[in-house]
């Protein structure tokens, strides 16, 4: 409990020091701690603690060291030390600092093993005091030769000297800052030191002086703008200047000249640039040029030229990262050495020094990665270091082999070393290796572009360098050679003939390459004859062409011939240059060995393709996305919404989508509103066949017997038609006549029902689940009664004689389809004896045999005449087989089809295939395959809350996410917000996190182009603060064209052509009250 309290008090103390600083600032002596004057090497207690808490891991040749306390700062000491018991000469060492922790780790020559650890807090010190030891928080460390400078959280600067034998002592302590020291840097030697603090000041210390006061104090503004990092620029010394750069919490980069005549204090920088919208947290100066890299909380890395001759106020290069950047560093060594493995085509150092050095950065928010970028391809990280714990700090390490090594410390108090040149390190990923050489994407106009680029062919030289190296004679020789090829092609055009079967492949004749207009020409067409390439000898190779760079052209882009290009005359032309073979590609070592190196690398080329797709019409998309209902308005039901969406789809010609919406509306109304219980189709009962009659009656005199004969005959004929969907009719003859009349006036199919859907009986979305639950409860209660009724009907039908009509069927009946549909809707299922489809029965009234598979519905006429002898013979034989048990009667085709769709073979119930849920699922599956994102998203918004078992949450989020992205890409922001508003609560919460984020707007001065921060006015409190003026140039940004007063807040623009704007009230008075039609600015622009 006491340990947790002490830990919380230490965190509170650090937080208080960062905000308020020390309470007493008059004391010139340090008050942080007291160090006993005992040697660190001779202390046995230090060695015991080192062996007890510190361990090192050399697995996979990686240096690792665990510290027993929290560490936050890291640096490298480059001086020669001789440690007792070790014969080697140690040059590079690690300095780690943290809470009550400051240790020097002596590393071996190979940097794979730690030889010794020196506790610098136990160094000899001349600053003795009787005060007890207090909290020491080493926030930053900087080294120069054998000197180590540390910046503490209480504003004290401590200086340590390391002797050649490894002993250390404190040589000075300076305290003039009020808050935490964030940055330290030496100026050309170990005698002058810069310190930047959270109190907004930069102080220059002379370490040779006995005074503990700074030589100079520099401040960016009169108010306190905390300094996150500062560094001395060695490139400005040639102009007799002491240039210092600093970054602040305001996001500004300031440049100071310490050789000023203003005395010991400077309150304004020489130059100031606003590079970041949020706090700038780190900076580092380029090793060779006047370039500085800065990183900030706005997730950006800026590369800026701070030289005297530059006049721009914006960064020269900008890298967008995936997190707030807390530390950014240029690499120590160039990339020339490592190009032999990764970048095989670049054997020489590139003339642009920006590409010779990599940039590494770490992130806030407990991110466990360090990303390495190169400006040659700044959009894709070159390498990423993955750690198990969040990265606290890192540096580029110097070493004897000049390899690219990074030293890191993590929040788990672990020091680690990573060699970026080792391919075996699993913790260092290379994203470029996981990418394809060819990529494509769609734009808003339904066109797409394909980009092709070599994997490591990214570090492009400047166009000017390529032009200077290529002389005019080379261009003339290449141009003459190209013209000669064209004449040869035209001369061979008449002699070249190709068969319709073997046509030469079409090749890419021109691609969009920005560098082609400067140094190279388009690749020459390469075509093949009927059996292959044109016969060319080696004399036509690049060796016979004077001063021609063959490798400067990219490989050809071919495609297979199509039917539309068989007669193309352009495909008959051929080139005299054959393409490289598969064994000699542009990336193979053999090809590079036999050809001279290129003077300029091939940039990526873009292939734009425009394909007019009718389904992606812009007007159709806007119409459907704007007018389709995604929610149920007041007074409407789901049926009404479906019908309205159907009309919207029909208005733009999407007839299939329109019919799907109508089908859903009818299925909803029929299944859940009509009050008729859904019918169930039961499995065939084999035991019912045992009760079939053994003989067949010829006629019947009773009216009821006649009715039964008609019914049985209908079932018998329907069983003949295995592929038909019709059935028999039960009821009176008057009912049959009435239905017969209805079938003449209407087709009776499902589409007529859809077109005549009634809204009066529609239901609301809230009653959907209740009615569905009520229907399911009634199903189980009436299942047994329906089953008994079917059994009675099946048994009763076999007690009556069967009469076969001798009247021929009307196969050309126009109402045949409608009768079948009506029969399916109103007739219960029946059991009959099916005759094989190959049997042909002769009719007594027909001159030719007719197939028994003719349609027989409500229009079928059943005769009481005697059936024909073949039929009677077959029936007797069939009944005899059934009665003897030698054969079982087969079920009808409809029954077989329904039985195949059953999930249980034990006779379970079968539901209708046109149920609402089934139709909805099938419609969504089809729309997903077709890419109809509008239908999927609209259906998800309407039915997700009602039928969650049909539409999963993952599908709903995926469809709506893609739909919102498409809407935003097409600038339909109102429709996108409406989609988010109409989603359910759980879906809406997740969509808002992704697509409803706050925007950060950056405003620049219209006169000096500086970023409008107005820090002076913000803290001075004079006047009304805003962004309608600029502190840098002291000019107003916009004035009303009518009253000539500043436009604070909302302003109305007269027209985009003239650009004049003013207050809303002023322009209302000018145009509406005074009824003027011209712009009040006098430009003559007419608004009407």
Swiss-Prot record:
Keywords, A to Z, come to: Metal-binding, Repeat, Vacuole, WD repeat, Zinc, Zinc-finger
Ranges annotated as biased composition (Basic and acidic residues): 769-794
Q: Does the keyword Repeat apply?
A: yes
Molecular function per GO: zinc ion binding
Pfam families in the record: WD40, zf-RING_16
Region Disordered, annotated ranges: 26-56, 537-597, 709-751, 764-829, 844-871
Report the InterPro entries cross-referenced here: WD40/YVTN_repeat-like_dom_sf, WD40_repeat_CS, WD40_repeat_dom_sf, WD40_rpt, WDR24, WDR59_RTC1-like_RING_Znf, Znf_RING
Q: Which stretches are WD repeats?
A: 131-170, 176-215, 222-266, 275-314, 367-417, 432-473, 502-546, 631-671
Q: Entry's Gene3D superfamilies? A: YVTN repeat-like/Quinoprotein amine dehydrogenase
Zinc finger spans (RING-type)? 1040-1083
Give the primary localization class. other
List locations, semicolon-separated: Vacuole
Q: Report the protein name in the record.
A: Restriction of telomere capping protein 1
């Amino acid at each position: 409990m006491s340990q947790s309290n002490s830990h919380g008090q230490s965190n509170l103390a650090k937080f208080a020091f960062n905000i308020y600083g020390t309470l007493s600032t008059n004391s010139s002596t340090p008050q942080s701690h007291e160090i006993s004057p005992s040697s660190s090497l001779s202390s046995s207690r230090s060695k015991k603690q080192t062996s007890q808490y510190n361990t090192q891991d050399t697995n996979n040749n990686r240096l690792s060291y665990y510290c027993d306390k929290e560490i936050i700062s890291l640096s490298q000491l480059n001086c020669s030390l001789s440690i007792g018991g070790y014969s080697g000469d140690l040059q590079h060492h690690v300095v780690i600092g943290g809470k009550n922790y400051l240790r020097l780790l002596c590393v071996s020559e190979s940097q794979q093993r730690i030889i010794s650890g020196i506790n610098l807090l136990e160094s000899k010190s001349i600053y003795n005091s009787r005060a007890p030891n207090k909290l020491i928080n080493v926030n930053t460390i900087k080294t120069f030769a054998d000197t180590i400078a540390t910046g503490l959280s209480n504003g004290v600067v401590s200086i340590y000297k390391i002797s050649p034998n490894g002993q250390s002592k404190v040589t000075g302590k300076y305290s003039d800052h009020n808050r935490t020291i964030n940055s330290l840097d030496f100026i050309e030697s170990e005698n002058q030191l810069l310190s930047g603090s959270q109190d907004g000041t930069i102080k220059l210390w002379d370490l040779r002086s006995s005074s503990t006061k700074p030589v100079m104090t520099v401040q960016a503004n009169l108010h306190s703008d905390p300094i996150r990092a500062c560094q001395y620029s060695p490139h400005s010394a040639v102009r007799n200047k002491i240039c210092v750069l600093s970054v602040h919490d305001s996001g500004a980069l300031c440049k100071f000249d310490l050789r000023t005549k203003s005395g010991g204090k400077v309150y304004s920088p020489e130059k100031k640039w606003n590079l970041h919208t949020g706090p700038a947290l780190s900076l580092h100066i380029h090793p060779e040029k006047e370039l500085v890299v800065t990183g900030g909380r706005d997730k950006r890395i800026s590369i800026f030229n701070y030289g005297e001759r530059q006049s721009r106020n914006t960064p020269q290069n900008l890298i967008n990262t995936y997190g707030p950047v807390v530390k950014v560093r240029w690499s120590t060594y160039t990339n020339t050495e490592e190009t032999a493995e990764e970048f095989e085509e670049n054997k020489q150092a590139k003339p642009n020094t920006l590409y010779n050095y990599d940039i590494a950065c770490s992130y806030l928010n407990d991110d466990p990665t360090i990303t390495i970028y190169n400006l040659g391809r700044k959009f894709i990280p070159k390498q990423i270091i993955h750690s198990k714990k969040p990265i606290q700090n890192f540096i580029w390490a110097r070493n004897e082999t000049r390899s690219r090594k990074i030293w890191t410390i993590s929040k788990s108090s672990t020091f680690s070393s990573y060699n970026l040149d080792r391919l075996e390190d699993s913790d260092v990923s290379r994203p470029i290796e996981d990418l394809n050489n060819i990529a494509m994407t769609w734009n808003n106009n339904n066109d797409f572009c394909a980009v092709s680029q070599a994997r490591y062919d990214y570090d492009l030289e400047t166009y000017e360098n390529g032009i200077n190296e290529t002389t005019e004679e080379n261009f003339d020789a290449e141009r003459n050679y190209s013209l000669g090829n064209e004449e040869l092609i035209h001369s061979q055009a008449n002699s070249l003939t190709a068969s319709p079967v073997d046509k030469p492949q079409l090749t890419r004749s021109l691609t969009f390459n920005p560098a082609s207009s400067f140094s190279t020409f388009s690749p020459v067409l390469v075509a093949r004859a009927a059996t292959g390439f044109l016969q060319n000898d080696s004399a036509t190779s690049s060796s016979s062409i004077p001063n021609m760079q063959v490798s400067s052209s990219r490989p050809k882009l071919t495609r297979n011939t199509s039917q539309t290009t068989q007669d193309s005359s352009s495909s008959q032309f051929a080139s005299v240059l054959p393409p490289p073979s598969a064994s000699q590609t542009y990336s193979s070592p053999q090809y590079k060995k036999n050809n001279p190196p290129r003077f300029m690398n091939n940039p990526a080329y873009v292939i734009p393709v425009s394909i007019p797709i009718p389904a992606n019409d812009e007007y159709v998309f806007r119409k459907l996305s704007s007018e389709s209902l995604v929610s149920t308005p007041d007074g409407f039901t789901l049926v009404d919404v479906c019908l309205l969406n159907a009309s919207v789809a029909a208005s733009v010609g999407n007839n299939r989508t329109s019919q799907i919406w109508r089908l859903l509306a009818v299925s909803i109304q029929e299944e859940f509103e009509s009050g008729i219980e859904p019918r169930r189709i039961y499995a065939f009962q084999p035991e019912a066949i045992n009760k079939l009659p053994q003989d067949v009656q010829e006629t019947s005199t009773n009216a009821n017997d006649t009715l039964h004969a008609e019914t049985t005959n209908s079932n018998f004929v329907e069983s003949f038609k295995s592929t038909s969907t019709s059935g028999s009719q039960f009821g009176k003859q008057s009912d049959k006549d009435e239905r017969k009349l209805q079938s003449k006036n209407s087709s009776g199919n499902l589409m007529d029902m859809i077109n005549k859907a009634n809204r009066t009986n529609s239901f609301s979305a809230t009653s959907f689940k209740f009615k569905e639950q009520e229907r399911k409860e009634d199903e189980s209660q009436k299942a047994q009664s329906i089953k008994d009724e079917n059994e009675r009907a099946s048994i009763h039908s076999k007690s009556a004689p069967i009469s076969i009509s001798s009247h021929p069927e009307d196969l050309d009946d126009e109402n045949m389809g409608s009768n079948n549909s009506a029969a399916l809707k109103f007739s219960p299922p029946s059991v009959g004896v099916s005759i094989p489809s190959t049997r042909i029965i002769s009719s007594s009234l027909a001159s030719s045999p007719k197939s028994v598979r003719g349609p027989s519905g409500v229009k079928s006429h059943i005769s009481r005449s005697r059936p024909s002898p073949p039929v009677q013979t077959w029936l007797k034989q069939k009944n005899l087989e059934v009665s003897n048990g030698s054969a079982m009667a087969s079920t009808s085709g409809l029954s077989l089809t329904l039985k195949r769709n059953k999930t249980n073979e034990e006779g379970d119930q079968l539901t209708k295939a046109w149920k609402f849920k089934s139709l909805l699922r099938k419609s969504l599956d089809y729309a997903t395959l077709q890419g109809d994102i509008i239908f999927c998203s609209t259906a998800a918004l309407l039915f997700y809350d009602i039928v969650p078992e049909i539409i999963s949450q993952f599908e709903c989020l995926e469809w709506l996410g893609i739909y919102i992205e498409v809407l935003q890409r097409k600038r339909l922001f109102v429709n996108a917000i409406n989609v988010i508003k109409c989603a359910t609560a759980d879906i809406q919460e997740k969509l808002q996190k992704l697509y409803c984020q706050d925007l950060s707007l950056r405003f620049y001065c219209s006169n000096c182009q500086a970023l409008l921060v107005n820090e002076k006015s913000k803290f001075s409190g004079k006047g009304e603060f805003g962004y309608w003026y600029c502190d840098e140039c002291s000019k107003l940004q916009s004035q009303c064209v009518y009253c000539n007063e500043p436009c604070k807040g909302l302003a109305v623009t007269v027209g985009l052509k003239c650009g004049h704007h003013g207050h809303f009230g002023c322009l209302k008075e000018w145009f509406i009250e005074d009824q003027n039609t011209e712009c009040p600015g006098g430009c003559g622009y007419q608004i009407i």
